[in-house]
Every structure is written in C-alpha cells, then in structure tokens.
Amino acid sequence: MKKSTATPAPLPVPLWRQQLHYRLKEGALIAVGALCLYLWMALLTYDTSDPGFSHTSNVDQVQNAAGRAGAYFADILFMVLGYFAYIFPLLLAVKTWQIFRERHQPWDWSGWLFSWRLIGLVFLVLSGAALAHIHFHPPASLPFSAGGALGESLGDLARNLLNVQGSTLMFIALFLFGLTVFTDLSWFKVMDLTGKITLDLFELVQGAATRWWEARNERKRLEAQLREDEPVFKAAPMAAEKREPAKPSLRERILKREEPPAQPVEPREPTLAREPIVPPRETAPEALAPRETVVPRQQHAAPTIVPPSAASRAPEPSKRAMKEKQAPLFVDSAVEGTLPSISILDPAEQKKIEYSPESLAGVGQLLEIKLKEFGVEVAVDSIHPGPVITRYEIQPAAGVKVSRIANLAKDLARSLAVTSVRVVEVIPGKTTVGIEIPNENRQMVRFSEVLATPQYDEQKSPVTLALGHDIGGKPVITDLAKMPHLLVAGTTGSGKSVGVNAMILSILFKSSPEDARLIMIDPKMLELSIYEGIPHLLCPVVTDMKDAANALRWSVAEMERRYKLMAAMGVRNLAGFNRKIKDAQEAGEVIHDPLYRRESMDDEPPALKTLPTIVVVVDEFADMMMIVGKKVEELIARIAQKARAAGIHLILATQRPSVDVITGLIKANIPTRMAFQVSSKIDSRTIIDQGGAEQLLGHGDMLYMPPGTSLPIRVHGAFVSDDEVHRTVEAWKLRGAPDYNDDILNGVEEAGSGFDGGGGGGEGDDAETDALYDEAVQFVLESRRASISAVQRKLKIGYNRAARMIESMEMAGVVTPMNSNGSREVIAPGGPRD
C-alpha cells in the first residue's frame, strides 16, 4: 500500500472571526476616509492668520473650516511638504480603498511587504516635495517654500549636484518608483489600458461618422427616388392606351433573353427571391403597371440573393474582436484569468464572388428542364446562393408529390454534372421544395470569422459552440447547455474530428477554468492528446478505455453529489447554485457545505464555491463500447438522463454509425445530433432518423438537428487547422497549469483493474490497492449481505469507495450482479476469505 504524502489541510477559520475581519476592514475604510476628508478640508481652508506651529497668532475666531486642530494639522503639512500636502490625503485614501477591495481575502500579515509599502510612500513624498520646490515658486500663503522643509532641503542639495534637469529626472524616477511600490501599480497595464481606451474612442467616433454618412446617403437616395417617381404618378390619369409600357430593366432583359412564349401552363422564369407566385403577366395596358411590379420586387429580392458587392464584405466584427485588434505591448500580457485573443487564429480570406444573377438563373432554367424530362412540372421560385451550396426553391405543379422529386436526387446530380444533390422536402413556413446544388468553387469557412461575430460574443453560456455557417453564410452559434448532450457521427474524412476540435476551441475561447472543465477520452491517442496540459482538464487525456469507464463512473458520482448539494441549497440547476454562491460572496457571507460530515465537534464545514460546467468529450465511443461493454452504455444513459441540471454534458463522436454503437437507449436520451457525410441512407437514418447525410459533400458539411425539432439544418463547419489548436493550447498553458482530480483515474485500480471487456479477476489488485478490501469481503461473507450501505456503515467509509468494493467483489465472483430490484446475492461460501 502506498503511503499518502498529502499535506494536512489548514484548519478552517471560524465563521465569527471571518465576519469580524470583514467588519473591521469596513470600519477602517470609513474611519480613514473620514480622516482624509477632514485633512483635505483643513488644507483647502488654510489661512495664515490662524494659529499654527510656524507662526503665532492671537485671534479668537479661527477661519479654518476644520477648526483649531485642523489649522494646526494644515500648518504642519504645508510646513513639511508644501504643495504636496494636497496629494498626501489622496494617497492614503487610495491605499485604503485597495485594502478594502480585498476584504474577502484572508488576512495575511507580511512584515516584508509592509516595509516595502512604507519605503514606497517615503520615496513618493520626498520626491514629490522636491519636485514642487524646484519647479514652483512659493506663494505668500505657505509657511515655507513650495516643497516645504523636506522639499527645500532635498531640492537645493540635488540642484547643486545635478543641476535642474538632472534633479528633475532623478526625482521623477523616484516618484514613479515610489508610486509603483506603494500602490502596486503596473505601468505596463496602464499603457495597455490607455491603448484600449484610445481604440474604443476611435471606434466610437468612427462608428458615429459611418452611421451619419450612411444615413445621409440613404436620405439622398430616397429623395432621388421620389423625384424620379413623381412624374410617373402625375401622368397616371392620362390615356393609358396611347402610352407604351415602361422599358424593362437590364436585369429583366437578361433573365427574359431565352424565355419561351408565355403559355398559361408553362413554368415562369425564376425571379430571384421574390414574393409568392403570381399569375404570368400578359400585357400591361396601364401605364403604371411596369413600375408597380418591377420596383417593389427588386427591393424585396435584395435581402435574399446577395449581390457580389454585398457578399464580398466581411461580416461586422464583434466588440471583442475589435478590442483584440490592438496587439499586446508585451509578451507577458497573457495573465491568469484572461481569455486568449481571437487574433491568434488564422484570419479569414477575402471571399471572391464566383457567380452572377445570370448564371444562377441559367442553372434554374436547366433544373426546370431536367425535371420536366423526368415528368415533373416545377417552377423555380427563388435562389439562395451560399459559400458552399446554392439552394433553389421550386414550386411543384398541382398534383406533384414531393417524394417523386426526392427520388430523383441521384438522377439530377448526374444530369447537372455535380457531386450530389440534396432535396429538402419541407422548408418551414414555405410551400416550396428546396434543391441544394454544390457550388463550382467552394469557399472555406474559417473558425476565426465565426468567433469574431457578435452572435458568439453576446452568448453568456460558458459552453457556447461555434459550428460554422449555414447555407446563406450566416454564423451558426448554439449552446451546449440547452442541448444538453450532443451525438456526432460521420465517416472517415467527413470533417468530424475538425468539428469536435472547433467545439472544444469554442469553449476555450469563451470560458475560464473556473467556468468550464473538460474530461477528454481519446481512444485513437492522436485527436485529443494535443490538449494535454491545458488548465481546463479535470484529468489527463484518457487513452486507456479501462480509465475511460472509471471517468464516466466518476461523472455519475459527481452528478449525484451535485444533485444532493442543490437539493440541500434549495436551487433547481447549476446556474441557480452559482448565482446563490456569488450573491453570498458579494454580501461578505460564507455558505458552508451542508453535506459535510464532521468527524469531531471542532470541525468546521468547508465553504462552498461556484461549480464549473463539466463537458465529457469522447472522440470514438464505438471503440470504448467494444472494449468496456454494455456498462458504458448504461453510464452514458444515466448521465444523459439526469446530468443537465447538474451542469455535466456529453459530446459523443463516432465514425461507425451503426445500430450496435448508436443504440436506441443512447438515441432516446440524446435528441441533439450532428451528422457528417455517411456512406448510406441507413447510416443517415441511424443518426438523424431520416436520409440526407449520404448526400453531403464532406470536409465539414453537416446536418445539425437542434433540440426540440426534427428538421435538420445544413451547416458548413468551420475549419480549424492543427497550428491553430497548438497556438490555443500554448496560450492557455501560459495562463496556468492544470489542477487534476486524482480520484477520476485512481479509482480504476480500486474498482477493477482487470477489466478486460467483460470479465477477468481484479481481486488481487484490489486487495493490494485498498487496505479495507479484505475486511469488506469478510464482512459480506459472514453477514451474507452484499449491500453498499452496509459495507459503508461497517467500515465507516464513503459511498463511492464502498460501491467500488462491491463491484470488485462482483468481478471476482463473490457476489452476483445487481438484480432487477437492486439487490445482490452472496454466492461465495461462508467463512473468512483466504
């Protein structure tokens, strides 16, 4: 048995002493603040006619607002420090406020630190008084020079030795040194803060100017449009039969260049992103008809089909991205408690427009022709181009079933000479059918452009996930806490591992280790091992599946512990628990652990702290289920059923989406799924309960099924390179070391180190690692009771330790597995254990 080398924990401070400590600091702040105000009032109302140490006066009426004592105090300060006497009370007030701001920290007296602070104050006062004497003339109202007696003696001595310029330089250096030591001021932080404030002011002025300029241009455009439309409306009462219809625009002439003669049953030419279908226009007898149909339709089409000028513009960056544009002045700016800058990621490329409205209209015409060849009458209603695919929304003719169009997906892909075509049978809120055709030149979605959006910056959840862009190029941001678990599946090369890395980096760029912690299980030993050493990890990256089973078992135990803690606190979820703890800390109160069991009357329960959200990431849980067996499926089901309110979430990824891996038990408890490209429609139905994933393009193209809906959303996943992951990991390593919980993996040896897929005896190892295992077996054999609570009461140990002992006995053949009613039977013969 290994000897424990843990140092004994310090005795907790009694609650009454903590409360007294807080109140004394508050009282000291009030007293020193009142003293500083009194001194300042005395200095501001100083009068030479009042009595003082530097002169004599016999007046009966004191002019000083602070009274006779204030007159003496002001005279002493002016006599010693001169003009610097005005600064002295301010220094005391600033230092007192700094001490009060740390009132919740335990009091730790350090004589060495107090000496340094006193030395800093002395240097600050002496150098300030000397500078005042050198550069200011003494007025008649002061008893001595502008720097007082101290400033006069030091200033004259330094001026004789170093001249005025040398003396000024020396005293400025001493003043800054004293200010830094006394107030603990970092000039590097001051420079960084000054730069950020300057940048914010510049952005504010620039934004105001941009908004004014855009409003001015919009006003001019509206005025020009009104002037253009005014003659038309005035001429409307004229005889319409004598006027020619208005000349169509260049865009309409291009779209109608190859249009066949209008027939009542023929499909209409697609008008890009227009309103619902209207009957074909035969003639325009009224003079006003062309303007009433063309102009509003062009205005409505602009938000749907993105013109090249609008698509080339980058999305508006978030406030965080704008602030982080300023490069850090010093390498050591990565301090603990800050988040890495988004600028360490690769910037997004300038996207070029590879299409035109004419080319999109041509593809729409070809789509109508090909469907007509297969006996399906449709009309293209609107076109929605995106970075990777373009969606053509078609309106089927009366009597055409959507299933006929869906069955023609492969035939359309062959006819259009593209990789694949996906048919969207139902578009929420529309009567059209979507046909998604890949673009000839695919654009890459960079991870940095998704993180730099205001949608990601405005999310408050510590487990916010940035997935990528939808088919229209808009960012897709979701919250893992609302899922609350995620199932990811896709074949090799579909972008599944890159998608998992993007989710992990989304958490790392959003949360500190106090807000979110990670447990990573990597059977491949390559995908997640790169994150080894970041402070968010609760344990080292798990690569052994025996350790993985114990990590899940610890997660279940932690879930149960949090539920008991929240029930004792009277809250319903982790957010309410953390809010209650923070409110108590701000009020200067301490909430003790209600579940703490005292071993003696002198024991004080520890103070509660906020609990972080825990995310368990499994890169390939198919391999884990093959090695460990059905036990892992039960643990995953328990976590998925109950862990949402406890703040524990699962991200399960696999490249083998078969029914023996993604079982019905797992699917029933994890409704949020994400399907990358798969090889068959059966695999697609296994993941998202419908087809479509087999028609994806790969390389990050996915179907994301949000919680609470059965309609998947097509998302183009953001690309994360290995260099970006390395830079992010190194940035977090500079901010702190990981604080591992040894109970997560050490329990594997106690719970059954001979876990070989489904059997194996771990009895010898358990007896060697746990000194009480033999006593537990002897108690079970003698009492014939295989109860965890009985072993816990008999040996006076914790519940988790007793449960591991019972599980070890089950593996060794001492007791039977748990029956349907939760009980076990002792099958080994009675008597002491050999």
Curated annotation (Swiss-Prot):
The record's listing under Pfam families reads: FtsK_4TM, FtsK_alpha, FtsK_gamma, FtsK_SpoIIIE
Q: Which GO terms describe its molecular function?
A: ATP binding; DNA binding
- Which processes are annotated in GO (biological process)? cell division; chromosome segregation
Mode of membrane association: Multi-pass membrane protein
Q: Which GO terms describe its cellular component?
A: plasma membrane
Q: Does the keyword ATP-binding apply?
A: yes
- InterPro entries (alphabetical): FtsK/SpoIIIE/SftA, FtsK_4TM, FtsK_alpha, FtsK_dom, Ftsk_gamma, P-loop_NTPase, WH-like_DNA-bd_sf, WH_DNA-bd_sf
The portions of this protein that span the membrane are 26-46, 73-93, 118-138, 168-188
Q: Which residues lie on this side of the membrane: Cytoplasmic?
A: 189-834
Highest taxon of the source? Bacteria
List keywords of the entry alphabetically: ATP-binding, Cell cycle, Cell division, Cell inner membrane, Cell membrane, Chromosome partition, DNA-binding, Membrane, Nucleotide-binding, Transmembrane, Transmembrane helix
In which residue ranges is the amino acid composition biased (Basic and acidic residues)?
240-272
Q: Where is the FtsK domain positioned along the sequence?
A: 473-685
Span list, region Disordered: 238-318
In the UniProt record, does the keyword DNA-binding occur? yes
Q: What does this protein do?
A: Essential cell division protein that coordinates cell division and chromosome segregation. The N-terminus is involved in assembly of the cell-division machinery. The C-terminus functions as a DNA motor that moves dsDNA in an ATP-dependent manner towards the dif recombination site, which is located within the replication terminus region. Translocation stops specifically at Xer-dif sites, where FtsK interacts with the Xer recombinase, allowing activation of chromosome unlinking by recombination. FtsK orienting polar sequences (KOPS) guide the direction of DNA translocation.
Q: Which family does it belong to?
A: Belongs to the FtsK/SpoIIIE/SftA family.
Q: How does it assemble?
A: Homohexamer. Forms a ring that surrounds DNA.
What does UniProt say about this protein's domains? Answer: Consists of an N-terminal domain, which is sufficient for the localization to the septal ring and is required for cell division, followed by a linker domain, and a C-terminal domain, which forms the translocation motor involved in chromosome segregation. The C-terminal domain can be further subdivided into alpha, beta and gamma subdomains. The alpha and beta subdomains multimerise to produce a hexameric ring, contain the nucleotide binding motif and form the DNA pump.
Q: What protein is this chain from?
A: DNA translocase FtsK
- Source organism: Pseudomonas putida (strain ATCC 47054 / DSM 6125 / CFBP 8728 / NCIMB 11950 / KT2440)
